[in-house]
């Protein structure tokens, strides 16, 4: 049995090494992106529920429209978001430049320049995310809502039971861009029972990485893949295009890098990259204009869910907490969510003036 486990482990190791070698032999956008997605994105299927913090208006909108809003990461609470990852990449590049051969310098200088351009212009203008926390009753989160209090909605967005051809099956939730759904998918609903979403709109939950050593390890690996590709003469076009291919993957990866000071949040994110095809909406918050994408919660075939995947509703500490809870329960009753009334509960953190 132990030999079988050892053999299986070695096979997995060899497969990963083969995958990396394959990327080096053909370092294109797709191979790099697949490598990053399979190796470095931590898919979260064991954390149930995942909590989304919002205010009372946000709660009612989510429940009425069965959608969440993905906000442009440029306007989130960590001002250094994504920038720290680019600065770390530049630090690694400078270390490589001390020992690399001339053949590799063009790639490294090009990478450094692109990273600097992103830093100067704002690295995150095309990246949107929806944030969740592992903990639904965090004082640091409630503080952001002040005396008005907030609400955390506990979602189970991993798997759900469905039926296919009369048999029970497991489905995966899908966040669908409402604009894409209304302009592309909705027209096909009557003609086709299976409506796969565009890969850009289909995302899985990813854990945020707070440890700088882990962030460095990931960036070092991607830069080293580029160097190896140059060294072996595997560049498809030129060094600049290779850098752009790597940066495409980093657009998804860098939003999972956060400063260790935010580690208490234990944040989990859905991440999208806007390629110009999405409809961007705008809203006001704290005297700022926030760009966002409307994301419907659907099943993996883009069909409406019979049961909305909410498992817990926590009302944050506030002066009129009992009245808020009563109002939420009545709202749920009047909007077809009777099965969620017993899920509403107060925060265990006491309210203080």
Feature map (PLM): residue ranges:
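Partner-binding and oligomerization surfaces adjacent to conserved cores of proteins
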Residues: 2-353
